[in-house]
Amino acid sequence: MIVHIPAVLNAEQIARCRAVMQTGDWIDGRVTAGHQSRLVKNNLQLPESSPEHQELGEMIVRALWHNPLFISAVLPHTIFPPLFNRYDVGMGFGTHVDTAVRRNLDGSLRIRTDVSATLFLAGPEDYDGGELTIEDTYGTHSVRLPAGDLIIYPADSLHFVSPVTRGSRIASFFWIQSLIRDKTQRNLLFNLDTAIMRLTEDVAGNPALVSLQGVYHNLLRQWAEI
C-alpha cells in the first residue's frame, strides 16, 4: 500500500528545515546503508549526532503524531528518528530493499521496519530527476511530491531514486514499526477506517456505524502487537 499524505509540514516548518540544513555538515550517505545498498547509494546525509538532525527530527515526529491520515494508514508503534539526505546533480540510489531491522546511533532503539517513509523538503520546481520509484505487485510508481508532503510504502518494496539532473533534492526519510506487522492486515484496517470516516460524514448517527467501529477495533485488538 502506497499512500500520499499531503502537507505534513507547513510552510514555516519547511522553511526552518531548509535554513537549518543549509548550515549542516553533510557526510557520505553510505554511512547508514547496508552492505548491498552501499554499492548503489550515492548521496549526502546530515550526521545522526548533529544538533540539526535532532531539532528537525523532533519537529517531524511531532507533526506525524498529530496527522490523522498518517496514524490511520500506518498505525505506528515506533517512529525511527528521521534522517535527512541530499541528492546533488549526478547523485542517485540504485534499486534496493530497506534493512529489516534498524538501530539508532547509540543502540538505545531498535525497530522492525514495517513501513518506509520519505518526506519531501524540496519541491519539483527545485530539481529535475530524483524521482522515487517504488515497485509493487501492480507495477512501478514514480513519485516527486511538493515540499512538506509524505509518501509511505511497505518497507519490503524494491525502490530506487533516479539521478538528479538539476538542482538538489532534499528530504527526510525514516521507518516505522507498526502495531500491525502484516501489510495485508494493515491495508484492510486502513480501508475500513477510511470507509467509516466517509460514512460518518454522509450518514452520521446511523447505528450501523457503531457496529463497523466495533469490527475495526476488534480486528485491531486481535492483530496488534504492543
Curated annotation (Swiss-Prot):
Swiss-Prot/TrEMBL GO biological process terms: DNA damage response; intracellular iron ion homeostasis
Lineage: superkingdom: Bacteria
UniProt cross-references to SMART domains, sorted A to Z: P4Hc
Keywords per UniProt: Dioxygenase, Iron, Metal-binding, Oxidoreductase, Vitamin C
Entry EC no(s): 1.14.11.-
Gene Ontology MF, one: L-ascorbic acid binding
Residues that coordinate or bind Fe cation: 96, 98, 159
Binding annotation for 2-oxoglutarate: 169
Cofactor or coenzyme needed: Fe(2+); L-ascorbate
Residue stretches making up the Fe2OG dioxygenase domain: 78-178
Catalytic EC class: oxidoreductase
InterPro entries: Oxoglu/Fe-dep_dioxygenase_dom (IPR005123), PKHD_C (IPR041097), PKHD_hydroxylase (IPR023550), Pro_4_hyd_alph (IPR006620), Pro_4_hyd_alph_FE2OG_OXY (IPR044862)
Pfam families given in the database record: 2OG-FeII_Oxy_3 (PF13640), PKHD_C (PF18331)
Segments crossing the lipid bilayer: none
Annotated HAMAP family: Hydroxyl_YbiX
Protein name: PKHD-type hydroxylase Bind_0236
